[in-house]
Amino acid sequence: MIKEISVPKLKKPVFIAAWPGMGEVAYRSVVFLREAMGFKVFAKLEAGDFFKPAAIFVERGILGLPSLPAGFFSYLKRKNQPDIILFLGEAQPPLEYAEALSETIINFVKKYGASSMLTFAAKPEPIDHKADPGVWAASTNVTILKDLEPFGIKALKEGQISGLNGIILGVAKRKGIKGTCLLGEIPFYTVQIENPRASMNILKALSNYLNLGLNLSPLQERSKFIEEEIDKLVGYIKGEENAAPVPAIPTPLSEDDVDRIKKDLAAYSKLPQSVRERIEGFFKEAQKDMTKANALKRELDHWHVYHEYEDRFLDLFKKQSKEKGSH
């Protein structure tokens, strides 16, 4: 079910959709685009028909159903340019629901006059994580592929695009909407790790194609930071105290290695100062009143930094247990 918050009047909107996937390329690209250009949310997809809970959660002995993933539509009105509709899904549904979910979304954006759409995806390649990733395109329309060539985007000759970032394009074609996927190269050995450089190159191409005028310097800084951390962590994992430059094509990292890198990247993530101050405020409140711990946990999860604060968060409960035991 899609609930409309408002009904904007849009002119020939281009539709862009994304879900989480390899390297977080698609998801992070759309998050950046939405925040950088000030898109306004106008509808919410409540995907209860497409997601089923796999378990229930327990909090202080009380059982409850988990919140199901949702998706949000937002829009941007532009002068003398086609407007844009964005859709950002919080998670991909089981494969058997992918086509039905795609139809629901496509039918909705057609109502607003969308006749073309874009998705993003990762293209794993045997490249170094500091290499400048190429951008490829696959489309339902030959003319679009030719229009993309001047921006350094190469046509994908063969392959497949898995998940909703690909499936929705097939549904769009069936519904009369031209669909194109932009794929950013990422290293084989870091498919589970955020890759802002791939997102940056995709958005650079998109910005040129749609005349967006994006400032991508924040992604450039984030790319440098993550690449340096991967260098240090790969060196540490390989047992090198003074990590030498990573080989051009390193061997794939194990799941444990990837988990370690993810945790370290989370620990070093640069939150805005205002957010850190708000988190510290929640900690102080929770020390006085444990009912505030739920709000603290939600804030940590929202910013994806729970692991950074996990020990301190759990210490709140240990301290409470000791105080109860002393009474």
Which residue stretches match the model-derived regions?
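N-terminal short beta-loop-beta anion/metal-coordinating cradle
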Residues: M1-G89
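Charged/polar low-complexity intrinsically disordered segments, enriched in acidic residues
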Residues: S254-V305
